[in-house]
């Protein structure tokens, strides 16, 4: 495996809370995939703060992922096309769907993600890897001066 790209993102949790409040909850529906949305609602029902922290980490993970694959938030990278879920152990992992999944598969890209939050901030880091060999580097240009 070779590193395709890396991405990181830090978000202020209070900003996510403010957007969620301003949009009447629609922000979560716009950003989260269906499995993430279920977890968000369950966590928020138990604790408003934990629900918002979950939303912040998932928003951050999507931003970091979009940077790692070099697209930013442009097609085929869309908010709901990428979900960050958790193994039973708690380890986070990403799942792509639709055209994003096809785009990643065509390039042999997989990704590793980590997320964390602490009171004021949520942070994510993504390493995108590929099993497709990169094209050979161009030969260096020799410059001579007369």
From Swiss-Prot:
Principal location listed in the UniProt entry: cytoplasm
Biological process per Gene Ontology, one example term: fatty acid biosynthetic process
Recorded catalytic activity of this chain's protein: apo-[ACP] + CoA = holo-[ACP] + adenosine 3',5'-bisphosphate + H(+)
Enzyme class at the top of the EC tree: transferase
Subcellular location: Cytoplasm
Pfam family, one: ACPS
GO molecular function: holo-[acyl-carrier-protein] synthase activity; magnesium ion binding
UniProt cofactor(s): Mg(2+)
Cellular-component GO terms for this entry: cytoplasm
InterPro entries in the record: 4-PPantetheinyl_Trfase_dom, 4-PPantetheinyl_Trfase_dom_sf, ACPS, Ppantetheine-prot_Trfase_dom
Superkingdom in the source lineage: Bacteria
Residues annotated to bind Mg(2+): 9, 63
Keyword Cytoplasm (UniProt): yes
Key words of the record: Cytoplasm, Fatty acid biosynthesis, Fatty acid metabolism, Lipid biosynthesis, Lipid metabolism, Magnesium, Metal-binding, Transferase
EC number: 2.7.8.7
Annotated function: Transfers the 4'-phosphopantetheine moiety from coenzyme A to a Ser of acyl-carrier-protein.
Record-stated family: Belongs to the P-Pant transferase superfamily. AcpS family.
HAMAP family per UniProt: AcpS (MF_00101)
Protein name per its UniProtKB record: Holo-[acyl-carrier-protein] synthase
Species assigned in the record: Burkholderia ambifaria (strain MC40-6)
Protein's gene: acpS
